[in-house]
Amino acid sequence: MTVQIITIDGPSGSGKGTLAAKLAAYYQFHLLDSGALYRLLGLSLHKHDLLEKLDSHLDECVNYARQLNIKFETSAEGTLVFLDGEDVTQTIRTERVGEYASKVAAIPELRQALFERQRAFAQTPGLVADGRDMATSIFPEANAKIYLTASAESRAERRVKQLQGMGLDAKINDILANIQARDKRDMEREVAPLKPAADAYIIDSSELTIDQVFKLMVDYVNSRTVSN
């Protein structure tokens, strides 16, 4: 049976994760949060004092990427994420770990090490894959390719609300600066830079609600022959 694949790419804070989860639930597909993999690897390398030694200890870092001990569990509260048996669901969503992930994602050898792990998520009946290069690199054969974007300012505002909702301190100027820096790093990296696939459906969510974007996505996906 052919596995149907929906990709959602876009910059940090555009709403990819929330909408990918909604689509996966709607179509009863598997879900890949590729950003979580990079965050988990970044966190693991930081814990092992390797994040600042990527160049000098690259082989060791690649081995960590290949042997990353991770587990995803679905619960009533959402998806729980474990690293080496420890629940790191909240930890990996912090700005600091997001910066770790961006550093890791800029290293071609580490991206390659995570390539097959991501491909393995494509199982019947289908997959919703959320990331930066899902359509351009990991799943170019996807049935439906969505590129979700929004202005840096609107993404910063959303991120502040998200962090405050988690009980974390967040300053809009710091968040905006981090988003702009990550955008630049993601778009200018040599391997798999952040950009929409040539045949992607582009949605700017700056002035749209989650429900409005979700409807646009479902209409598009259904037009690409993926049925509910």
Swiss-Prot record:
| Broad class of where this protein is predominantly found | cytoplasm
The family database entries (Pfam families) matched by this protein are listed as: Cytidylate_kin
State the EC number(s).
2.7.4.25
Record's Gene Ontology CC terms?
cytosol
- Residues involved in ATP binding: 10-18
Its EC top class is transferase
Q: Name the GO terms of the biological process aspect.
A: nucleobase-containing small molecule interconversion; pyrimidine nucleotide metabolic process
Whose protein is this, by species?
A: Acinetobacter baumannii (strain ATCC 17978 / DSM 105126 / CIP 53.77 / LMG 1025 / NCDC KC755 / 5377)
What are this entry's molecular-function GO terms? ATP binding; CMP kinase activity; dCMP kinase activity
Q: Which UniProt keywords apply?
A: ATP-binding, Cytoplasm, Kinase, Nucleotide-binding, Transferase
Organism ancestry: Bacteria, Pseudomonadati, Pseudomonadota, Gammaproteobacteria, Moraxellales
* Name the record gives this protein: Cytidylate kinase
Family under the similarity heading: Belongs to the cytidylate kinase family. Type 1 subfamily.
Q: Where in the cell is it found?
A: Cytoplasm
* Reactions catalysed, as given in the entry: CMP + ATP = CDP + ADP; dCMP + ATP = dCDP + ADP
The family database entries (SUPFAM superfamilies) matched by this protein are listed as: P-loop containing nucleoside triphosphate hydrolases
